[in-house]
Amino acid sequence: MKFGISQSFPCSYLPDEQETLLVYAEETEHNTYYEMLMAAGFRRSGAQVYRPHCGACTACQAIRVPVADFAPSKGQKRILKRNSDITVVLSEQDKAHYYSLYEKYINTRHQDGSMYPATPEQYASFAHGDWLDPLYIELHLSGELVGIAVTDALENALSAVYTFFEPSLAERSLGTFAVLQQISIAKRLNKQHLYLGYQIDNCQKMQYKRNFLPHERFIEQKWQLISKKDW
């Protein structure tokens, strides 16, 4: 397999750090190696499969949930109950009205981030891949679309690519609710893991991922189990 290393650029999550990526550089066979690369700490954004390669900084840790062992916490059970009126629908096609919800979400909640301002081209660049068709987990409330979890379906795992939702419903914790639905769907499909991207302990935006227990983190080139007793 062939890999490339990106130029350094300002880190999106730790303001005083520079980020460098190790990128899978083969023009073909992405589908063949994607799951193996995920198991080695990589992640997909659009057509690109990458992992952090930042020299002295090791803050980014790939994180995944072994779904058969997961049990929701009391707080997560409350979120499930709070959203019991939401209908979950699976779609294999991107739909035109997804973008308007994405634009509203980015322009309301992430004005300080690298994805602002939202554009259709930017949405397509991370959600779509010319070698993989993701699964779209739709959240509906009273007949209205209020959330989308873009999810990759692999042979033995699901991977959470990106979730966006109606920003006026912040009290419903729809991001956490979407992950709970992804775990449930992974169990139903007999998958082993749900990949959640990267955990960065010093980044407040990432803290919700720590709450899905037990989980595994890719540390020093191997997956290490984190359970309640480790906190």
UniProtKB/Swiss-Prot annotation:
Pfam families per the UniProt record, alphabetical: ATE_C, ATE_N
One function term, GO molecular function aspect: leucyl-tRNA--protein transferase activity
Catalyzed reaction equations: N-terminal L-glutamyl-[protein] + L-leucyl-tRNA(Leu) = N-terminal L-leucyl-L-glutamyl-[protein] + tRNA(Leu) + H(+); N-terminal L-aspartyl-[protein] + L-leucyl-tRNA(Leu) = N-terminal L-leucyl-L-aspartyl-[protein] + tRNA(Leu) + H(+)
One GO term (biological process): ubiquitin-dependent protein catabolic process via the N-end rule pathway
Record GO cellular component, one term: cytoplasm
Catalytic class of the enzyme: transferase
Cytoplasm keyword on record: yes
Function: Functions in the N-end rule pathway of protein degradation where it conjugates Leu from its aminoacyl-tRNA to the N-termini of proteins containing an N-terminal aspartate or glutamate.
Entry protein name: Aspartate/glutamate leucyltransferase
Species this chain originates from: Pseudoalteromonas atlantica (strain T6c / ATCC BAA-1087)
Organism ancestry: Bacteria, Pseudomonadati, Pseudomonadota, Gammaproteobacteria, Alteromonadales
Name of encoding gene: bpt
